[in-house]
Curated annotation (Swiss-Prot):
Residues 180-192 are annotated as: Oligomerization. It comes from Sugarcane streak virus (isolate South Africa) (SSV). One of its GO terms (cellular component) is host cell nucleus. Essential for the replication of viral ssDNA. The closed circular ssDNA genome is first converted to a superhelical dsDNA. Rep binds a specific region at the genome origin of replication. It introduces an endonucleolytic nick within the conserved sequence 5'-TAATATTAC-3' in the intergenic region of the genome present in all geminiviruses, thereby initiating the rolling circle replication (RCR). Following cleavage, binds covalently to the 5'-phosphate of DNA as a tyrosyl ester. The cleavage gives rise to a free 3'-OH that serves as a primer for the cellular DNA polymerase. This is Replication-associated protein.
Length: 364
């Protein structure tokens, strides 16, 4: 049985994320046999050690069939591909089943036929332990956190469970739990959409910018030479940020550099309105270096930049990086970065054409 769309692409499917040991799927108007669907799902989640799969056919009001599937695994099934569970062109509604008991009861409320394999794991009455039972064994903190990791479905739920189960640790070590939450449930990078209509930059020397783009951004597979970064200095309201952000997938930093959300799949970086003295690892960024160590705030030191990508630095005249550098720093900067200084009237967008029939303003 074929699986449709099982590869991650650069389409909006990047925004999807599923992570849970209990997965609830509903295939609407699906004529496939429950056994065939169940066997396919069992095979599909083999990497996460399936322990139970229930596949139920239900009659819909219009006379067609739905297929409900409850899949339980020893390890959380994780995917960022919205088409991961597609079967022969049928795309399911995908949910994290917080209560496996309720989901199973719902799926079995009026079955036409069903198929199941493995041993159903009822939801624990409390995976934090029941201290009211005299012979109950108190869970260790490691067991508690392990259960929270397996059962939480998002960052907020994870932190809420930690707060409830380990209030003292939550109060005294919150920054570490926030760090682990970001690692377990990383933010999905949103595709930037410019709020302005597409237009041609009104530059005195567009060839300089176009040449930099061609040599350093558009030739992604060229590894013969290390790329050069780009420094753009000019007034505000000239469209620098919108233009730079519209070029492709990127890491964007404004006011400060936040390494915790570094996107390894980004094609370039943008440093927007950050003074030179407050930019960490500026040599690594400007020099398009790879595999360097950074120190995220409240997080552990880590290695980033598995590939060489250029950085676009955007600055206004009052925060000119070159003015704040030593001669040695300027030498390194100029050797690794193209510079474009906007002249009066230059901008990274074109003004709309004025109609010949437009009436002149009566304002004085």
């Amino acid at each position: 049985m074929s699986t449709v769309g099982s590869t991650v692409s650069s389409t909006p499917s990047r925004r999807f994320k599923h992570r849970n040991v209990n997965t609830f799927l509903t295939y609407s108007r699906c004529p496939l046999e429950p056994e065939a669907v169940g066997l396919h799902i069992w095979s599909l989640i083999a990497h996460w050690t399936p322990v139970y799969v229930l596949s139920v056919r239900e009659t819909h009001e219009d006379g067609g069939y739905h297929i409900h599937v409850l899949a339980q695994s020893a390890k959380p099934v994780y995917t960022t591909d919205s088409g991961f569970f597609d079967i022969d062109g049928f795309h399911p509604n995908i949910q994290s089943a917080k209560s496996a008991n309720k989901v199973r009861a719902y799926a079995m409320k009026n079955p036409v036929t069903y198929w199941e394999r493995g041993t159903f794991i009822p939801r624990k009455t409390s995976f934090l332990g029941d201290s009211t039972e005299p012979n109950s064994k108190k869970q260790s903190k490691d067991d508690i956190v392990r259960d929270i990791i397996e059962h939480s479905t998002n960052k907020q739920e994870y932190l809420s469970m930690i707060q409830k189960a380990l209030p003292y640790e939550w109060a005294t070590k919150l920054q570490y739990f926030e760090y682990s939450a970001n690692k377990l449930f990383p933010d999905i990078q949103e595709i930037y959409t410019s709020p302005f209509p597409q237009s041609t930059p009104a530059l005195l020397d567009p060839t300089a910018i176009n040449t930099w783009l061609e040599n350093n951004l558009y030739q992604q597979n060229s590894n013969s030479n290390r790329k050069l970064s780009l420094y753009i200095l000019g007034p505000t309201r000239t469209g620098k940020s919108s233009w730079a952000r519209s070029l492709g997938r990127h890491n964007y930093w404004q006011n400060n550099v936040d390494w915790s959300s570094y996107d390894e799949d980004a094609e370039y970086n943008i440093i927007d309105d950050i003074p030179f003295k407050y930019c960490p690892c500026w040599k690594q960024l400007i020099g398009c270096q790879k595999d360097y160590i950074v120190n995220p705030k409240y997080g552990k030191r880590k290695k980033v930049a598995s590939k060489s990508i250029p950085t676009i630095v955007l600055a206004n005249e009052d925060e000119d990086w070159l003015r704040d550098m030593t001669p040695a720093q300027q030498d390194y900067f100029n050797a690794n970065c193209e510079t474009y200084m906007l002249e009066p009237g230059e901008r990274f967008f074109s003004l709309p054409a004025v109609s010949a029939t437009a009436h002149p303003s009566s304002e004085v």
